[in-house]
Amino acid sequence: SKALRLKREILLANPVLDIDKIIVGRYKIGTTARQVNPRALGTQNNNWSNQTSASRGGFNAEIAELSNLRGDIKTRTIFKPNNGSSVPDLKLHWDAERLMFSMVDTDKRWQVFEVKLDGTGLKKLIETPEKDLEFFDATYLPSGKIIAVSNIGYNGVPCVNGNDEVGNMCLYDPKDGSLRRLTFDQDANWAPTVMNNGRIMYTRWEYTDLTHYFSRFVMHMNPDGTEQKSLYGSGSYFPNSTFDAKPLPGHPSQFIGVISGHHGVTRSGRLMLFDPSKSRKSEKGMLQELPFRDRKIEPIVKDRLVDGVWPQFIKPYPLTDKYFLVTAKLDENSLWGIYLIDVYDNLTLIAEFEGEGLICPIPVKKTPIPPVIPDKITPGSKEIGRAHV
């Protein structure tokens, strides 16, 4: 045990933790905290739905700051809903002074909010006269605009008779309140994230005329919605789903993501490093699985891809190209805690609390703002467009 303590001290001495502050979603669950899946931490109900299908109440949740990461963890509440809402979709602004998140509003509809890290300045970020619209899963843009997922299409997932609403992406400009739909997909978009080059990566579920158990691909596009292209997974049966994709700092192509199934385990799964410049299909562009660098990645074609697989990971955050924060549950009797994981197979606990679950770790530090990609469209223009097939 002395050797293990020493190992832990050495791993936590890593300079990547000099930030000494992490933002998390904190969920007080109670005696079932070791048995719950990510639904209890505010995520979607399954791998084909978005936030409109998630629970809208009954949570004891807050956005918290963890500090003193190498010792006895200190906690500070940044924001706590007073209506029992969860607080998913945490995104820290590049200035590290404010963050956005999703929360159920007074009318029980999902909306995107912002709060300063000192707990002040709570405000709704997207205002629209369309009272039926809900917004969630949003991200800041370098231009000052916002991309959010919304129920704007008023359509549902076919195989559940439309009972789970589909979320497509919208572009919102806080300066003039303009809202424009970016994607017109039959099924869901998830997790828009700004890449290092200013483009947007996201997961798209393709459904029509294919085996939709295996078709949640990583896409990328310009912030104005133009040039939507596959980034990883198109034309492959493995993996079924890639969630929570985030670019590695300073790298032009590599990203980290969680692969999961269709039915079965919800939202969490195996942690993978990808490089589309190596390949864009199946396991061929996967650099390694964390924390199993020497284990061959087999392209398993299976509906419930990660059922019975441990550890389970969700919501990774790259600190460098080798070190990452991640939410993990190590086995079926473990808590959902925050870990430091690296490409050398080390998995080090930073924080967990009995009776609770922690999710979505984000380091409190300023980060470079990606370049602004100018709009390539003129809304309202009547010029004829041409498409080549």
Task: Give the label of every model feature segment.
Residues 61-67, 113-119, 163-176, 215-226, ...:
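Beta-propeller blade signature
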